[in-house]
């Protein structure tokens, strides 16, 4: 990974986004559905792109919105639709476009009061609360967000009635319908003028902020945080929760300071990320330089990304915690301090999250539920109240209410961040100190990731590998215990391969946007063993790709 010389430094003026030009491109540029990259494509968290690249333009939003209206009608979803936005420049225009289509279809849309920005967890919370106890007239939602992506990006995320990110069956349906509309030059898309849509009897206002904030004590022990008198620093990174934090401080009498309350679609206040781009990633030490500088001024400092579904934790003892480390600490704390949680509640993790989570879960006597990358895989289990905590290595997590009922079914950066304050208050030590104690008992993992070139054909082979195509008996001097291409928790394809030994593992997956594959690795045997795992992993994967290519050639003759 080549680190930019700008990484960790304030963004130079020449790097800042030309917002008027981006908005003009959103309306003026027309995507070509014959160009693969310009089609609608739902990844692990919705459709994302930039208006400059003709990958996120008004035509995309019109087509996706029409497709969602048809999906709702086909699947008898006729309750309100909760519609939120983050602070990216394209989010408000996309919201306006979507409303024109939704209102034309007579969908009851719940916009935020005062056109407030709306964190993803506030939308998920609204859907879950509305649908509780209902079997008909169910609500769903849309959030306009590209998550922590650079300022020029836009994103469109659909949350069905379970309140979480849509699964592949849903997104495939919407994607196919939307692309058909693009191919037909939007013929069949219903829309009405924006002012008419705002005045429509089906357009309503919803107080997302207070509905969410007033319910927070049901998921985090904020009374303990207040009683401990902790000093908490918060950097919203210019994101959708910027006005939520002062309300949280006031409502729960917490000594909480927002270190930067600026909202600016150029995100000029950010320090540059590792690759020389502006990115609002709370798990990146380069993007988090400002808050890391406040480490000794607060008992705990926290941040969230642009739609506030991801978290970053800065401790006096450890600085910025790696996301895997904090997930393990959160699980260790929650399952010991939630007496109303049922004994059969499981822990959810993705296949590339740390095996320390497995060890903590085993120590607690809980069941592990391991799924492919993507938080959407947890939504149904959270909705049914079967998963107590769910986390992914990219700093996303949520968990049940203190009474064991569903809180959100999508990632919640606010709750995860406040949990760090609860841990500090109730354990008498910050999450970094808890992690140090945990690893003294269970072992300290070393984590890493490398990338290797892969052609589109090789990426396709990697995503469809079978365990039998992966050859080898040992990895870094240890016997291989398992080779999987499907997740143990739900038997869904992981889109690659994971190989595990007693003290280490690697997982290889193709990139969705570049001609590379990524190898994630971990070792409880130290950095040297991790380096061996990553090196041998590339050899194993390259051999499997060659075998897969040979098999493909044989079958095509």
Predicted regions mapped to residue ranges:
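Phosphate-binding and adjacent anionic-ligand microenvironments
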Residues: 298-300, 313, 337-557
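Conserved phosphate/anionic-ligand binding catalytic regions in large, soluble enzymes, centered on
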Residues: 37-56, 146-149, 236-244, 308, ...
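Gly/Ser/Thr-enriched, mixed-charge loops and adjacent short helices
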Residues: 2-38, 134-136, 152-295
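Short glycine-rich or small-residue beta-strand-to-loop segments that form or flank ligand, phosphate
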Residues: 50-51, 80-86, 110, 231-234, ...
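Glycine-rich phosphate/diphosphate-binding loops that line cofactor/substrate pockets in enzymes
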Residues: 65-81, 221-228, 295
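N-terminal small/polar loop signature for handling phosphorylated ligands or for N-terminal nucleophile
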Residues: 20, 74, 82-153, 247-313
